Amino acid sequence: MNQNFSSMIDQYKHQQLRIGSVSPKQIHAWANKILPNGEIVGEVTKPYTFHYKTNKPEKDGLFCERIFGPIKSGICACGNYRVIGGEKEEPKFCEQCGVESVDSRIRRYQMGYIKLACPVTHVWYLKRLPSYIANLSDKPLKELEGLVYCDFSFARPIAKKPTFLRLRGSFEYEIQSRKYSIPLFFTTQGFDTFRNREISTGATAIREQLADPDLRIIIDRSLVEWKELGEEGSTGNDWEDRKIGRRKDFLVRRMELAKHFLRTNVEPEWMVLCLLPVLPPELRPIIQIDGGKPMSSDINELYRRVIYRNNTLTDLLTTSRSTPGELVMCQEKLVQEAVDTLLDNGIRGQPMRDGHNKVYKSFSDVIEGKEGRFRETLLGKRVDYSGRSVIVVGPSLSLHRCGLPREIAIELFQTFVIRGLIRQNLASNIGLAKSKIREKEPIVWEILQEVMQGHPVLLNRAPTLHRLGIQAFQPILVEGRAICLHPLVCKGFNADFDGDQMAVHVPLSLEAQAEARLLMFSHTNLLSPAIGDPISVPTQDMLMGLYVLTMGNRRGICANRYNPCNSRNYQNERTDHNNYKYRKGKEPYFCSSYDALGAYRQKGIDLYSTLWLRWRLDQRVIASINREIPIEVQYESLGTYHEIYDHYRVVRSVKKGMLCIYIRTTVGHISFYREIEEAVQGFCRSYSYSYGT
């Protein structure tokens, strides 16, 4: 990133950056700069960093001050100081060393470049899947790798000059006849002439194949072939059908890739490098640790390796007249491998290691991963009005609520609490308000609760892989130091309660708060945005708890009363650990669920005790009763009788008909039913409030 580019971002307030291929002309524009004396600098030609005696950057090296700017602001390589931006008409550079008098921060964005002696294929576009070069050229990846690393040669498809040999297609360079009949009879100059006329190998062959075809023609031909394959239909052979399907998928990817190149104004031949950009020195520093021992970034060593091999190839092509062509092609392969290691170490097999058997970190290692430049440095920045803590389960919370510890909440909403204290004339200035907050006076917590009632918060769990990774909640104060979360929202966050941490953010603007309420609240994100399946589903521990709550005694009254195994102890009196006496045959009766739960709280009955609960009369229940035959009918002297069924009994009167119904249940079933009933009623109230009914 050069100075013009960074100033453009500041001037126009751009909100995004696009990463992609650039032309050699653009790389020149980034790196080249014209000194006041008219000299153009920017090319790095030497693999050196600092001089071992003077400890100053080497000229035209990886840390050259002429290319990347001064190490200290206003001080040139000679040690002379000049005022930056002075009004006097003094030269802005040193005439002796050629270093500009600018701010040293220029070394954070001023780039350089290495002029490669031969084209080099960008390994990301060749070896990464999908291989863009293979897709666009419609050739097997293995054949392209053979061309890139000089194992194959390719006859030029369009002979623009007279040819001496009739070569067609690609041929393996390792064949003995070709190996001994082509390169060994030429000097360096003669072999270059032969290659320019007859054959093409290395990244040069890839560049020619990418530059020749028109992208629109590729799209049209791929579309025609795709339609022809679709019209053929099934062949009856599964292998052939799968082969045709893979070919159609490949054609679709090829058309999409060509359209992307056209849409972004990127030329396919830019995937082959002629100029290699050199990062600014501050992004690949050399520092001194304890004892004065220097520590260098691995990128510097990989750059040095590229420069060494590139300079060797340049010498072979320019100074040596009798170098065999075999040696030239071998050196081109070494340059390609050095650039591959710089961009992505280990992508072609065993990674390059240093003297301590440690793998060098390449560009890919610096960028990707959790500790890479994007996730750790750019996306992992700390922001104001945010906190972080461990999450624990909050079973009593509503789906749209979360529990914030007092320590976190008072820090997040401190400015709002200060404003509330001043508005209510409880503090005359900000200092007194902060002192009340430090002393944790009771009025502070009251104002904090008022502020939190109308202010949602955002919870985020890294990595945020989809939009449900950050959701809005209505906060409430809880004790402790952990964030309480409803267990049903864990699936959207891909979180569990084994030590996971989540970040909490406070939306400040009205637009952010409105977006949080309308789009990001957890109770409005119940379905997966990808496939539409429910995302808020009970977890395994919740299902286990519901099973334990409702298991009770699953056998009916008939099985309990007339089972031979129970007849022996049927009339025996039993005393439990709470000294509550009851008979198995005389199960308690309750008029309402409140009475049953009250007896459970007073330890009169346990969670699984069977009981009879009076139930409201319902036409659907009456209709189902009329279709069943009772197990037993008990008559009383006052004209009432009891019809006993498997799980309920009906009290009838000879004169008045059905009087009431008792169902046979447990305290666990009652608790579960009441929770479901309250949830349904709450949903109906919110639905009617939202739609004004």
UniProtKB/Swiss-Prot annotation:
Zn(2+) binds at C76, C78, C94, C97. GO terms for molecular function: DNA binding; DNA-directed RNA polymerase activity; magnesium ion binding; zinc ion binding. GO terms for biological process: DNA-templated transcription. Pfam families: RNA_pol_Rpb1_1 (PF04997), RNA_pol_Rpb1_2 (PF00623). SMART domains: RPOLA_N. Keywords: Chloroplast, DNA-directed RNA polymerase, Magnesium, Metal-binding, Nucleotidyltransferase, Plastid, Transcription, Transferase, Zinc. The keyword Metal-binding applies. Belongs to the RNA polymerase beta' chain family. RpoC1 subfamily. In plastids the minimal PEP RNA polymerase catalytic core is composed of four subunits: alpha, beta, beta', and beta''. When a (nuclear-encoded) sigma factor is associated with the core the holoenzyme is formed, which can initiate transcription. This is DNA-directed RNA polymerase subunit beta'.
